Amino acid sequence: MGVQTTVHLLRHGEVHNPEGVLYGRRDGFHLSDLGTRMAQRIAETIGERDIVHLRTSPLERAQETGAPLAAVRGLTPVVDPRVIESSNVFEGLSFGDGAMTIVKRPHLWRHLYNPFAPSWGEPYDEIAGRMVAAIHDARDAARGHEAVIVSHQLPIWTTRLFLERRSYVHHPKNRQCTLCSLTSVVFDDDRMAQVRYSEPAGDLIPVGDRSAPFSAGGATQEDRP
């Protein structure tokens, strides 16, 4: 066995989003009080591990999620635009009606022609490509130790599908990537050996939000995705 290095992909915590907006890459969406507790739970759970490198998405919710862990480990996070949320033409819409949100807007139908790309947002191949490049850099920075990358649900899930050689086509509610979950990529030297999944803050997630495609902390039931 060679040198083992683990890169943890950490999804951000719950976001204060009372209008249930698909926020995507928009600025101004911060962690809710519950999201802050989730971030603190991460620091408490893995803060004593051999984590020597931390990088985050540029978006506020990701940086706020990584802050408690950075403080515990005495690390200065690297802000990496390669691990940002994926782009999406539906950004800014409220999805309280689920798929009906789009059905009611015929002008948006033209974006639905190809679920394999997908035609409504950043191509899956491009998401996986930029994420894997960031993972490799984090692995190299933490070789023989552990690293954490704070990112977002779709980039993390797309990366896992790529690493496990599975189809990118999926239903958003079937993603195994809850708030503040860890998708841990274990390397043997430069070879990926396995992918692990855990939910250190799983007990803090409201039952109805576990399979939500994005976070809507503070939203009424009608406005939640």
Which ranges hold each PLM region?
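Phosphate-coordination/substrate-recognition cap region in phosphate-metabolizing enzymes
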Residues: 41-108, 224
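Glycine-rich phosphate-binding loop signature in dinucleotide/nucleotide-binding domains
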Residues: 48-50, 138-145
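Active-site signature of alpha/beta-hydrolase-fold catalytic machinery across serine-
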Residues: 68, 158-162
